[in-house]
């Protein structure tokens, strides 16, 4: 990974104070963490540094407390979840700067792990304020960023600290960037991208960037309806951003000029109601009834996607093909996910996927572990796919 240092470059950390930025923005219900995936992702970096004798000081944000302390957004309950995942004692300090932080850090010995309170309890965090960044840096000798999911934000703990202390990429960021490099940076071709989800409006930058970089773009979900409408196909009562038809047309023109094939549904599963047990029918795409909604792509469309996956060396996936959260409209997404997973297991495909709905869909299909890489980074993954610079990553590149 050219351009920045990883933990492999960090030779002697015994007794050093390592400020480690992690993503602990996990779901909590009634004071209990309900999903520890993000903690599990950063556990290898925490334990590696601890095992090497570093004083590991965890920096993280949680929720949106608007720059002031808020008991609802305290990281204290999360410290217990981190302890459970690591199977190690995790100390807690009631502030990330000032006397409480200094006292807790001063009491540490090599190998100890300390979680500091929510960085967003201070307005200086999101403003990337130099004074606040200095106050954070006062408790560290080395900075390691392992929060790729926050790398698209130029905040004090994700970007500012990298300018004040020797900066390194943690194992999560390293794995993420290496996977993304394989996916779009320097991929094996042909590259197929699957982009789904409800709205074109949220993914214009993404689609515009992808048509210049991939060989085939499969468009699914509600956003496919806008492209179908732009082509003059009636989509009945389906979710459709009719005001973006010209944008969709331009993306199709750009794709043609770049030599990128665009694959739209050729058939669809439609229903009059979006509810469990609704009566459905499968129709050709130019025969959608006026009173029906497209809620999934049909079997002919799935076969078309599979044909492209047979030719592809690389797959980048963001967004489901249909309304997968409600059966039977999950069928196309599940089938394509399982097919891509099989091709990956057979070493015929490099598969990189990301985005909340995509991760949920792959978990539903029980194939997350079969993909080459599944990003939990959300907004950062999307901005990377859009071709944008990520401040938290750029700050590590020296």
Swiss-Prot record:
According to the UniProt entry, what is the EC number of this protein? Answer: 2.7.2.3
Keyword Transferase in the entry? The reply is: yes
| GO terms for biological process, alphabetical | gluconeogenesis; glycolytic process
Annotated binding of ATP, by residue: 203, 325, 355-358
Keyword Phosphoprotein in annotation? no
Keyword annotations for this protein, in alphabetical order, are: ATP-binding, Cytoplasm, Glycolysis, Kinase, Nucleotide-binding, Transferase
Q: In which pathway does it act?
A: Carbohydrate degradation; glycolysis; pyruvate from D-glyceraldehyde 3-phosphate: step 2/5
Name of the protein this chain belongs to: Phosphoglycerate kinase
């Amino acid at each position: 990974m050219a351009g920045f240092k990883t933990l492999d470059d960090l030779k002697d950390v015994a007794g050093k104070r390592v400020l480690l930025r992690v993503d602990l923005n996990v779901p909590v219900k009634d004071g209990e963490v309900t999903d520890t995936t993000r903690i599990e992702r950063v556990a290898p970096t925490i334990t590696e540094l601890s095992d090497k004798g570093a004083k590991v000081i965890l920096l993280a944000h949680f929720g949106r407390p608007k720059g002031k302390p808020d008991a609802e957004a305290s990281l204290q309950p999360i410290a217990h979840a981190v302890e459970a995942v690591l199977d190690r004692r995790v100390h807690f300090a009631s502030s990330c700067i000032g006397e409480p932080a200094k006292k807790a850090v001063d009491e540490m010995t090599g190998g100890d792990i300390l979680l500091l309170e929510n960085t967003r309890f201070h307005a200086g965090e999101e403003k990337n304020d130099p004074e606040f960044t200095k106050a954070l840096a006062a408790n560290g000798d080395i900075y390691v960023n392992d929060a790729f999911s926050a790398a698209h934000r130029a905040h004090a703990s994700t970007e500012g600290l990298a300018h004040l202390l020797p900066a390194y990429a943690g194992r999560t960021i390293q794995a993420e960037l290496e996977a993304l490099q394989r996916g779009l940076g320097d991929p094996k071709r042909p590259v197929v991208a699957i982009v789904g989800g409800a709205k074109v409006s949220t993914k214009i930058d993404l689609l515009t960037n992808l048509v210049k970089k991939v060989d085939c773009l499969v468009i699914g979900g509600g956003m496919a309806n806008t492209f179908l409408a732009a082509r003059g196909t009636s989509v009945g009562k389906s979710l459709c951003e009719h005001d973006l038809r010209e944008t969709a047309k331009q993306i199709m023109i750009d794709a043609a000029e770049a030599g990128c094939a665009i694959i739209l549904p050729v058939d669809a599963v439609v229903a009059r109601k979006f509810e469990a047990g609704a009566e459905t029918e499968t129709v050709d795409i130019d025969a959608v009834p006026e009173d029906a909604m497209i809620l999934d792509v049909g079997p002919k469309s799935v076969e078309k996607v599979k044909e492209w996956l047979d030719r592809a060396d690389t797959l980048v996936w963001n967004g489901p093909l249909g309304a997968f959260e409600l059966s039977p409209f999950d069928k196309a997404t599940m089938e394509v996910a399982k097919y891509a997973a099989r091709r990956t297991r057979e070493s015929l495909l490099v598969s990189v996927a990301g985005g909340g709905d995509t991760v949920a869909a792959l978990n539903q299909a029980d194939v997350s572990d079969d993909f080459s890489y599944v990003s939990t980074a959300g907004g950062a993954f999307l901005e990377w796919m859009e071709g944008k610079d990520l401040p938290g990553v750029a700050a590590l590149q020296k």
